[in-house]
């Protein structure tokens, strides 16, 4: 059983933008939250792919404009569907809550082609069983993500990253990966999607939710230190993707 994703309110990004933050819109699996008001009304917080939109997208692109030489602005974000060939126009795809994805064969094929062409994927806001549970044959959100990647790019593999990887020093010099997630008592892990030559094609923020920090940092509603780290990580990810 699946729920159709609610339509987004994504606008067309400015044609002058060098970088567009492309968020993947997907059909979701049946899902259950521990909170009754969300369990009984799954769309009360929006579909999983929508979480933290559009504030987090606007915040990251705005900071890229202010802190780097990348030509972009706070309106340079866009929602995309994997079935649409427009994904090949964007070097960076952002997945929110990928543990709830329900991809069809064409979406899987396009995702594989996108990655092989050099596109970079970022997976965020998913975690080990505890807060959320998927009803179905796969219950661990990471395994759902791994499942689709193994179909899309079976020759690639997910590896645990440590602080020595260049992505953590691309623009900001990240001092530690030991950070607190915005909620829960999970311990964040950083996983990379690498090809047979060890080249990095994507990163997964497991047991973490950088987008949640991005959404709230300028509102004074987030813990300052991990929120700053999460923003630095996001900018590093984008610049790494654009330069590799």
What are these regions (language model features)?
Residues 1-4:
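Bacterial N-terminal signal peptides
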Residues 10-92, 98-99, 209-210, 216-244:
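Aromatic-Pro/Gly-enriched surface loop or interdomain linker
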Residues 21, 87, 92-133:
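Short alpha-beta junction capping motif
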Residues 24, 124, 206:
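Alpha/beta-hydrolase-fold catalytic nucleophile elbow
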Residues 29-37, 128-216, 226, 230-231, ...:
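An acidic, glycine-rich "communication" segment
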Residues 57, 61, 108, 112, ...:
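Extracytoplasmic/secreted envelope proteins and their assembly/folding machinery
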Residues 70-80, 123-127, 155-164:
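Surface-exposed patches in mature extracellular/periplasmic domains of secreted proteins
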Residues 75-82, 104-110, 185-189:
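Alpha-helical scaffolding within the catalytic cores
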